[in-house]
């Protein structure tokens, strides 16, 4: 919502646009209502994680620790890991009159650091970006994992930013680390397009995508509630934000990174994968079937005979997409009686069987026309490639 909706509302407020919504709210009123409802939701979200989800994870042997909870052996291991794997990819940037505030990329995790020169007592502000090329959570080896009731944990480790924070002396040799505070910003990701004026829409979108890659206007600052006023005001000033744009998060920033734990080989903690079914009317067709679970008898009907007899309504994801829609497109691509294929693509994956079938249809001499929606939000680059 912040990438697009909130960013758009902020632009309307700055442009003094006071158009009312159907329920009579101005852009400013909508922003106020978003903040009013979102702050308690964020607080509840972090409370649920810390007081409910984390204890449940611990019961299952998944221990997300704080650095201060580690014993000396565990600290030594992670400190060595920092020196060998993390330190080489870090680039701390000081901010002073000769070094302007660095560009903060969208949704990147950062540390605001205050260091002091022990000789001059002068303090400096610096920013350390938590590298996105490394896992957000650093695991301990099995022999160092936390034990509970004599059982070794399935996973033990700490967030990456804590390993960095407790080794800041390596990044600022000769300086005294005064304080550090994590923060994250969200930038406007909407494309500013004047479609009526654009001679080439595809080229215009490509240009806007390059701008978005450099980063749109900041619209939100996420910090901890303990972040002091001096750091808050510094970040707000350099990012061009106001107090209303601050969202306090007491806990992990960027909870979506917890998806990391879904990759752990613990099948008992996961729902069994849902097996989509193929409608019975499509289970005995002549054409080769993409779904290997469907038999391919030679005496079956072809796809078009089935739908010619009666319309077929399918429900996804309960019924197989590959065994219905993909099979339909693939059948058409290879059917000599099909002369032309026309369809619209809004979002599709990089290895889409739909696209492969359309390419095969064109190679088979059929007339293929595809309308690709270039403005599918956050899929623009992918759709430009297919277009």
Curated annotation (Swiss-Prot):
Amino acids binding Mg(2+): 347, 377
Family per record: Belongs to the polyphosphate kinase 1 (PPK1) family.
Entry comment on modification after translation: An intermediate of this reaction is the autophosphorylated ppk in which a phosphate is covalently linked to a histidine residue through a N-P bond.
Any single GO CC term annotated in Swiss-Prot or TrEMBL for this entry: polyphosphate kinase complex
Enzyme Commission no: 2.7.4.1
Keyword Hydrolase listed: no
Keywords, sorted A to Z: ATP-binding, Kinase, Magnesium, Metal-binding, Nucleotide-binding, Phosphoprotein, Transferase
Pfam families per the UniProt record, alphabetical: PP_kinase (PF02503), PP_kinase_C_1 (PF17941), PP_kinase_N (PF13089)
Full protein name: Polyphosphate kinase
GO MF annotation, one: ATP binding
Catalytic activity: [phosphate](n) + ATP = [phosphate](n+1) + ADP
Cofactor: Mg(2+)
